[in-house]
């Protein structure tokens, strides 16, 4: 086209000084002579040019108005064949047009569909309101692609529970998977799904609070970042001034809308309890309580603060829901789904008393039958809101774990001190009806420390405390606690051998766990004496520093050989896969605490065969603690794992023998089994083929000498002070390495 005929040039000429504003402008009006001259040179085959505007001649305003409306009523069409658009993207405030769709494709390979709308016939579809039809709820493919089969099942169970589809008018559940099965990832998947979608094409919830022990706040923050990247920004709080924390909590709880900027709050139990008033002022879509067995006491302040939250949906994570008794188990179930087991008094009368009566070793056949009936009734109710998978699932993904309970003889000094204490303190007199009274707790602590090393009770000997009067005469001359002397403790002697053999014959790293920081002090002295590089984590270490030293220790190139861990401070949730050997130096009354600590190395990412050593002093209170653990573990197993034939070998009345010393045994625990697989202390028949580390100790291998051991390191350490060993492996080794 000639430039002079362009609309912009024509308009300029029209607005010139000679133009008449009142005269209608017709862009197609051109002198006839110019048009005839130009058309001489146009090919007869060329299509005629169309006018610059298709505006028809409008005789009146009505026709013009109708024409404009017709133009504006035509929707814009993207010139791509079969283009339907991405309905999942935000529409910048405009209402979306078109049929409601799921956020993700439910028919894609590997899609995890949590909800499938009911099928509607074509006839009903015509009459249905298209704006109210439910859609599929599909887990984000970024997450569903990394979920293992048991985790996909777990996410589906969690979603069904918190949306009220399993129990009417109940929106809570307990995730009771054992350690290492990915409970955190399953909960993050649930959170992300609820925040983004629902059958009604909108988010199910707007805000989530994750409450965890302070040592795991940073871990949760990192896990959210790991799996969700930058798509969500969580707020993590575990420290700071009161005003600063209150300000952050007010900002969080006051957020409103379909998609708020910071929808996830991660907070420690202690901080939540202190600032609960702020969080009680708003509504929260979901509350997740990690290590939820902290809520076993329904009367403590943390439980009351959390239970007062305006949050229907509640998920409690606990690998060990039963720790001490069934009433604590009731508290956990009552927290997530209030009322399904009645009141505490009703639960005790209806379930707890008959079940415990039937589980006692002295129970009659009638009591056993009644207890079993009540147990099945309880299981049928609770299983609707509790999911539990045991760690045997991990055998598909993790290397073999060899767990060993090592009984160590007391040294002559320990025996003399032990007998002196029992003679002077007379702790048996403080026991009543097989239950541990408050007055006997100090005696228990003294005996446990003596089993670890005489150095731990040396101060009491100096001051002549009850039970240790005249004990100084038993110590070697010129004895000093400044230097550790392994030869004075049977367990310390065995530990010294284990560390030396591990250091010289393998490339493995070791985690040392104890309930007492004083014992960790002894470990430090031993490491300095043997020139082992080590790191230590206890309650004095800040959360930020904990994360740094764990990351450094897990680095294969780091020189640290030993990681010392206080089970009270860091036994839960830590990932220490840089080591593959773990020593539990002293037992805890609660089997859950020991299991949590022992699960630090046998976790996702571990590549080497794991060896767990549980050291006990032979014939002492430590073996009684192990026996009490067996009772608690059997109780947990029969209620949560639903095992039918969990053996109970110990009557509650036998706890009266707690304060005694059996000097003539290789293992007091093995003696109580009345084991039929062993003859004269030697195993003649192996345990059942399907037995593993989760079984009762009676179904483990029993070794009165080192010939039956599978661990070369423990074999080499036997002659130090070992009297008896129970050992079992997690699963059959698929790679030929044991």
Swiss-Prot record:
UniProt short sequence motif DEAH box, positions renumbered to this chain: 290-293
Keywords, comma-separated and alphabetical: ATP-binding, Helicase, Hydrolase, Nucleotide-binding, Phosphoprotein
A GO MF term: ATP binding
Helicase ATP-binding domain span: 164-339
Reaction equations catalysed: ATP + H2O = ADP + phosphate + H(+)
PTM statement from Swiss-Prot or TrEMBL: Phosphorylated. Phosphorylations at Ser-566 and Ser-567 allow efficient removal of RAD51 filaments from DNA.
Coiled coil (UniProt feature): none
One GO cellular component term: nucleus
Annotated S-S bridges: none
Subunit structure: Homohexamer. Interacts with RAD51.
Protein known as: DNA repair and recombination protein RAD54-like
